[in-house]
Protein backbone atom coordinates (compact mmCIF):
# COMPACT_ATOMS: atom_id res chain seq x y z
CA UNK A 1 0.00 0.00 0.00
CA UNK A 2 1.44 3.37 -1.01
CA UNK A 3 0.49 6.97 -1.67
CA UNK A 4 0.95 8.08 -5.28
CA UNK A 5 1.77 11.72 -6.06
CA UNK A 6 1.54 13.45 -9.44
CA UNK A 7 3.68 15.90 -11.38
CA UNK A 8 1.88 19.28 -11.44
CA UNK A 9 0.71 19.11 -15.07
CA UNK A 10 -2.51 20.85 -13.94
CA UNK A 11 -3.12 23.03 -10.86
CA UNK A 12 -5.14 20.34 -9.05
CA UNK A 13 -2.65 17.53 -9.72
CA UNK A 14 -0.10 19.56 -7.76
CA UNK A 15 -1.89 18.74 -4.49
CA UNK A 16 -3.71 15.52 -5.36
CA UNK A 17 -2.61 12.12 -4.03
CA UNK A 18 -4.03 8.67 -4.68
CA UNK A 19 -4.00 5.39 -2.77
CA UNK A 20 -2.24 2.60 -4.65
CA UNK A 21 -3.66 -0.55 -3.08
CA UNK A 22 -1.60 -3.54 -4.18
CA UNK A 23 -3.50 -5.90 -1.87
CA UNK A 24 -6.71 -5.63 -3.95
CA UNK A 25 -7.13 -8.77 -6.05
CA UNK A 26 -10.21 -7.98 -8.17
CA UNK A 27 -12.20 -5.01 -9.42
CA UNK A 28 -15.52 -6.88 -9.73
CA UNK A 29 -17.74 -7.54 -6.69
CA UNK A 30 -19.50 -10.88 -6.11
CA UNK A 31 -22.88 -10.06 -7.68
CA UNK A 32 -25.19 -12.04 -5.32
CA UNK A 33 -23.74 -10.04 -2.41
CA UNK A 34 -24.51 -6.64 -3.96
CA UNK A 35 -27.64 -4.54 -3.88
CA UNK A 36 -28.82 -1.37 -5.63
CA UNK A 37 -28.19 1.76 -3.59
CA UNK A 38 -30.98 4.32 -3.90
CA UNK A 39 -29.60 7.87 -3.69
CA UNK A 40 -31.58 10.42 -1.65
CA UNK A 41 -29.62 13.59 -2.40
CA UNK A 42 -30.11 14.48 1.26
CA UNK A 43 -33.88 14.80 0.77
CA UNK A 44 -36.80 13.09 2.49
CA UNK A 45 -40.06 11.87 0.92
CA UNK A 46 -41.51 15.41 0.86
CA UNK A 47 -38.60 16.55 -1.30
CA UNK A 48 -37.09 19.08 1.11
CA UNK A 49 -33.45 18.90 2.23
CA UNK A 50 -32.98 17.16 5.57
CA UNK A 51 -29.18 16.63 5.35
CA UNK A 52 -27.07 19.45 3.95
CA UNK A 53 -24.19 18.98 1.48
CA UNK A 54 -25.37 15.75 -0.16
CA UNK A 55 -26.12 15.06 -3.81
CA UNK A 56 -24.60 13.85 -7.05
CA UNK A 57 -21.62 11.53 -7.01
CA UNK A 58 -20.82 8.30 -8.80
CA UNK A 59 -23.33 5.44 -8.77
CA UNK A 60 -22.59 2.76 -6.19
CA UNK A 61 -23.67 -0.78 -5.47
CA UNK A 62 -24.10 -1.71 -1.80
CA UNK A 63 -21.95 -4.64 -0.68
CA UNK A 64 -23.72 -6.80 1.90
CA UNK A 65 -21.19 -7.16 4.73
CA UNK A 66 -21.36 -9.81 7.45
CA UNK A 67 -21.09 -7.70 10.62
CA UNK A 68 -22.52 -10.46 12.83
CA UNK A 69 -19.91 -13.18 12.10
CA UNK A 70 -22.46 -15.70 13.36
CA UNK A 71 -21.44 -18.66 11.16
CA UNK A 72 -19.89 -20.52 14.06
CA UNK A 73 -17.36 -23.31 13.63
CA UNK A 74 -17.37 -23.37 9.81
CA UNK A 75 -13.91 -22.57 8.37
CA UNK A 76 -13.65 -20.16 5.45
CA UNK A 77 -10.94 -19.32 2.93
CA UNK A 78 -10.18 -15.74 1.88
CA UNK A 79 -10.92 -15.67 -1.87
CA UNK A 80 -10.47 -11.98 -2.75
CA UNK A 81 -9.69 -8.58 -1.26
CA UNK A 82 -11.87 -5.88 -2.82
CA UNK A 83 -12.55 -2.14 -2.87
CA UNK A 84 -15.84 -0.98 -1.35
CA UNK A 85 -17.06 2.50 -2.40
CA UNK A 86 -19.39 2.70 0.61
CA UNK A 87 -16.69 2.66 3.32
CA UNK A 88 -13.07 3.60 3.97
CA UNK A 89 -12.00 -0.01 4.65
CA UNK A 90 -11.47 -2.72 2.06
CA UNK A 91 -13.50 -5.93 2.20
CA UNK A 92 -12.61 -9.62 1.86
CA UNK A 93 -14.75 -12.31 0.24
CA UNK A 94 -14.88 -15.54 2.25
CA UNK A 95 -15.66 -18.96 0.74
CA UNK A 96 -17.03 -21.17 3.53
CA UNK A 97 -16.51 -24.92 3.59
CA UNK A 98 -20.27 -25.48 3.18
CA UNK A 99 -20.35 -23.40 -0.03
CA UNK A 100 -21.70 -20.11 1.35
CA UNK A 101 -19.95 -16.83 0.51
CA UNK A 102 -19.83 -13.72 2.68
CA UNK A 103 -18.03 -10.37 2.80
CA UNK A 104 -16.16 -9.22 5.91
CA UNK A 105 -14.06 -6.14 6.67
CA UNK A 106 -10.46 -6.75 5.61
CA UNK A 107 -8.02 -6.60 8.57
CA UNK A 108 -4.30 -5.84 8.39
CA UNK A 109 -2.27 -8.94 7.49
CA UNK A 110 -5.10 -11.11 6.13
CA UNK A 111 -4.01 -12.59 2.80
CA UNK A 112 -5.82 -14.43 0.02
CA UNK A 113 -5.78 -18.17 0.72
CA UNK A 114 -5.70 -17.85 4.51
CA UNK A 115 -8.31 -19.58 6.67
CA UNK A 116 -10.58 -17.76 9.13
CA UNK A 117 -13.27 -19.02 11.47
CA UNK A 118 -15.72 -17.55 13.96
CA UNK A 119 -17.12 -18.95 17.19
CA UNK A 120 -16.17 -19.35 20.86
CA UNK A 121 -13.48 -21.98 20.10
CA UNK A 122 -11.66 -20.00 17.38
CA UNK A 123 -7.92 -19.34 17.77
CA UNK A 124 -6.64 -15.83 18.51
CA UNK A 125 -5.58 -15.13 14.91
CA UNK A 126 -6.18 -12.15 12.62
CA UNK A 127 -9.63 -12.32 11.01
CA UNK A 128 -11.13 -14.79 13.48
CA UNK A 129 -14.23 -13.65 15.39
CA UNK A 130 -14.94 -14.63 19.00
CA UNK A 131 -17.06 -13.50 21.95
CA UNK A 132 -15.14 -11.01 24.11
CA UNK A 133 -15.20 -13.48 27.03
CA UNK A 134 -12.85 -15.79 25.06
CA UNK A 135 -10.37 -13.07 24.01
CA UNK A 136 -7.37 -12.44 26.31
CA UNK A 137 -6.77 -8.99 27.80
CA UNK A 138 -4.44 -6.78 25.75
CA UNK A 139 -5.66 -8.13 22.39
CA UNK A 140 -6.33 -5.65 19.57
CA UNK A 141 -9.82 -6.11 18.09
CA UNK A 142 -12.18 -4.45 15.62
CA UNK A 143 -15.74 -4.93 14.31
CA UNK A 144 -17.20 -4.97 17.84
CA UNK A 145 -20.83 -5.52 18.80
CA UNK A 146 -22.59 -3.31 21.36
CA UNK A 147 -25.45 -5.78 21.83
CA UNK A 148 -25.03 -9.56 21.45
CA UNK A 149 -26.34 -10.73 18.08
CA UNK A 150 -27.09 -7.24 16.73
CA UNK A 151 -23.99 -7.00 14.55
CA UNK A 152 -20.84 -4.92 14.89
CA UNK A 153 -21.19 -1.18 15.43
CA UNK A 154 -17.75 -0.05 16.65
CA UNK A 155 -14.22 0.09 15.17
CA UNK A 156 -15.22 -0.53 11.53
CA UNK A 157 -13.47 2.22 9.54
CA UNK A 158 -10.02 2.05 7.90
CA UNK A 159 -7.23 1.70 10.46
CA UNK A 160 -9.63 1.42 13.41
CA UNK A 161 -8.75 -0.76 16.37
CA UNK A 162 -9.79 -1.15 19.99
CA UNK A 163 -7.90 -2.79 22.82
CA UNK A 164 -9.42 -5.22 25.29
CA UNK A 165 -8.15 -3.77 28.59
CA UNK A 166 -9.76 -6.07 31.16
CA UNK A 167 -12.79 -8.23 31.98
CA UNK A 168 -15.09 -7.75 34.99
CA UNK A 169 -17.78 -10.42 35.52
CA UNK A 170 -20.33 -9.81 32.71
CA UNK A 171 -18.50 -6.90 31.08
CA UNK A 172 -15.30 -6.33 29.13
CA UNK A 173 -13.46 -3.00 29.23
CA UNK A 174 -12.51 -1.72 25.78
CA UNK A 175 -10.35 1.27 24.90
CA UNK A 176 -11.96 2.59 21.71
CA UNK A 177 -10.34 4.52 18.82
CA UNK A 178 -11.81 7.79 20.17
CA UNK A 179 -9.93 7.34 23.46
CA UNK A 180 -13.11 6.42 25.33
CA UNK A 181 -13.00 3.42 27.67
CA UNK A 182 -16.31 1.58 27.66
CA UNK A 183 -17.95 -1.48 29.20
CA UNK A 184 -19.34 -4.01 26.70
CA UNK A 185 -21.06 -7.32 27.48
CA UNK A 186 -18.64 -10.25 27.23
CA UNK A 187 -21.10 -12.12 24.97
CA UNK A 188 -20.60 -9.51 22.21
CA UNK A 189 -18.55 -10.64 19.21
CA UNK A 190 -15.33 -8.97 18.09
CA UNK A 191 -12.82 -9.74 15.34
CA UNK A 192 -9.10 -10.09 16.04
CA UNK A 193 -6.77 -7.48 14.52
CA UNK A 194 -6.91 -3.96 13.11
CA UNK A 195 -9.00 -2.83 10.13
CA UNK A 196 -6.82 -2.52 7.02
CA UNK A 197 -6.28 0.25 4.44
CA UNK A 198 -4.13 2.20 6.93
CA UNK A 199 -3.04 4.90 4.46
CA UNK A 200 -6.61 6.02 3.74
CA UNK A 201 -6.25 8.98 6.14
CA UNK A 202 -3.18 10.28 4.27
CA UNK A 203 -4.90 10.78 0.89
CA UNK A 204 -5.19 14.42 -0.23
CA UNK A 205 -8.36 14.92 -2.27
CA UNK A 206 -6.70 17.80 -4.10
CA UNK A 207 -9.67 19.41 -5.85
CA UNK A 208 -13.32 20.26 -5.34
CA UNK A 209 -14.46 18.06 -8.24
CA UNK A 210 -13.13 14.91 -6.62
CA UNK A 211 -15.25 15.66 -3.55
CA UNK A 212 -18.28 16.02 -5.86
CA UNK A 213 -17.54 12.55 -7.29
CA UNK A 214 -18.02 11.29 -3.72
CA UNK A 215 -21.49 12.83 -3.51
CA UNK A 216 -20.54 15.76 -1.26
CA UNK A 217 -21.80 19.25 -2.16
CA UNK A 218 -20.16 22.56 -1.16
CA UNK A 219 -20.32 24.01 2.35
CA UNK A 220 -21.12 27.68 3.03
CA UNK A 221 -20.47 29.65 6.22
CA UNK A 222 -23.46 31.01 8.10
CA UNK A 223 -22.08 34.57 8.18
CA UNK A 224 -22.32 34.86 4.38
CA UNK A 225 -26.01 33.85 4.34
CA UNK A 226 -29.16 35.92 4.77
CA UNK A 227 -30.92 36.07 8.16
CA UNK A 228 -33.69 33.81 6.82
CA UNK A 229 -31.14 31.04 6.22
CA UNK A 230 -28.91 31.18 9.31
CA UNK A 231 -28.74 32.88 12.73
CA UNK A 232 -25.35 34.37 11.74
CA UNK A 233 -26.70 35.80 8.48
CA UNK A 234 -27.34 39.39 7.47
CA UNK A 235 -25.71 42.64 8.57
CA UNK A 236 -24.27 45.51 6.56
CA UNK A 237 -20.94 44.65 4.96
CA UNK A 238 -18.76 41.95 6.44
CA UNK A 239 -19.85 40.88 9.92
CA UNK A 240 -18.70 38.28 12.43
CA UNK A 241 -22.21 36.99 13.08
CA UNK A 242 -22.62 39.05 16.24
CA UNK A 243 -23.12 36.13 18.62
CA UNK A 244 -21.52 32.95 19.88
CA UNK A 245 -21.33 30.22 17.21
CA UNK A 246 -24.58 28.32 16.67
CA UNK A 247 -25.89 25.76 14.21
CA UNK A 248 -28.44 26.78 11.53
CA UNK A 249 -31.12 25.76 14.04
CA UNK A 250 -29.79 27.92 16.88
CA UNK A 251 -28.05 25.28 19.00
CA UNK A 252 -24.62 26.32 20.43
CA UNK A 253 -21.73 24.63 18.63
CA UNK A 254 -17.91 24.40 18.67
CA UNK A 255 -17.35 22.42 21.84
CA UNK A 256 -20.88 22.58 23.26
CA UNK A 257 -21.84 19.21 24.77
CA UNK A 258 -24.92 17.72 23.06
CA UNK A 259 -24.81 14.12 24.32
CA UNK A 260 -28.16 13.19 25.89
CA UNK A 261 -28.28 9.47 26.59
CA UNK A 262 -28.28 8.95 30.35
CA UNK A 263 -29.30 5.32 29.90
CA UNK A 264 -25.83 4.32 28.64
CA UNK A 265 -23.74 6.73 30.78
CA UNK A 266 -23.02 3.90 33.23
CA UNK A 267 -21.17 1.96 30.51
CA UNK A 268 -18.68 4.77 29.83
CA UNK A 269 -15.72 4.45 32.21
CA UNK A 270 -13.58 7.25 30.73
CA UNK A 271 -14.84 9.93 28.38
CA UNK A 272 -12.86 10.60 25.22
CA UNK A 273 -10.36 13.45 25.50
CA UNK A 274 -10.40 16.65 23.50
CA UNK A 275 -8.90 16.37 20.04
Curated annotation (Swiss-Prot):
GO terms for cellular component: large ribosomal subunit. Keywords: Ribonucleoprotein, Ribosomal protein, RNA-binding, rRNA-binding. Belongs to the universal ribosomal protein uL2 family. Residues 31-42 have a biased composition (Basic residues). PANTHER family: LARGE RIBOSOMAL SUBUNIT PROTEIN UL2M (PTHR13691:SF5), RIBOSOMAL PROTEIN L2 (PTHR13691). One of the primary rRNA binding proteins. Required for association of the 30S and 50S subunits to form the 70S ribosome, for tRNA binding and peptide bond formation. It has been suggested to have peptidyltransferase activity; this is somewhat controversial. Makes several contacts with the 16S rRNA in the 70S ribosome. It comes from the Bacteria. InterPro entries: NA-bd_OB-fold (IPR012340), Rib_uL2_dom2 (IPR014722), Ribosomal_uL2 (IPR002171), Ribosomal_uL2_bac/org-type (IPR005880), Ribosomal_uL2_C (IPR022669), Ribosomal_uL2_CS (IPR022671), Ribosomal_uL2_dom3 (IPR014726), Ribosomal_uL2_RNA-bd_dom (IPR022666). Gene3D superfamilies: 2.30.30.30, Nucleic acid-binding proteins (2.40.50.140), Ribosomal protein L2, domain 3 (4.10.950.10). The lineage of its organism: Bacteria, Pseudomonadati, Acidobacteriota, Terriglobia, Terriglobales. PROSITE patterns: RIBOSOMAL_L2. Part of the 50S ribosomal subunit. Forms a bridge to the 30S subunit in the 70S ribosome. Residues 24-48, 224-264 are annotated as: Disordered. This is Large ribosomal subunit protein uL2. One of its GO terms (molecular function) is structural constituent of ribosome. GO terms for biological process: cytoplasmic translation.
Amino acid sequence: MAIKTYRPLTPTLRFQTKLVNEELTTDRPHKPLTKTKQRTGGRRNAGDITIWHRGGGHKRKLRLIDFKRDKSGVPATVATVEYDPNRSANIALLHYADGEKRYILHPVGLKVGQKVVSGPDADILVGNALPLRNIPAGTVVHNIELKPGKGAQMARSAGAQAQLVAKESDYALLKLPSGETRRVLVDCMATIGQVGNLDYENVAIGKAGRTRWMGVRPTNRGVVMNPVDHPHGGGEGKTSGGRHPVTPWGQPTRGYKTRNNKRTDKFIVTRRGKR
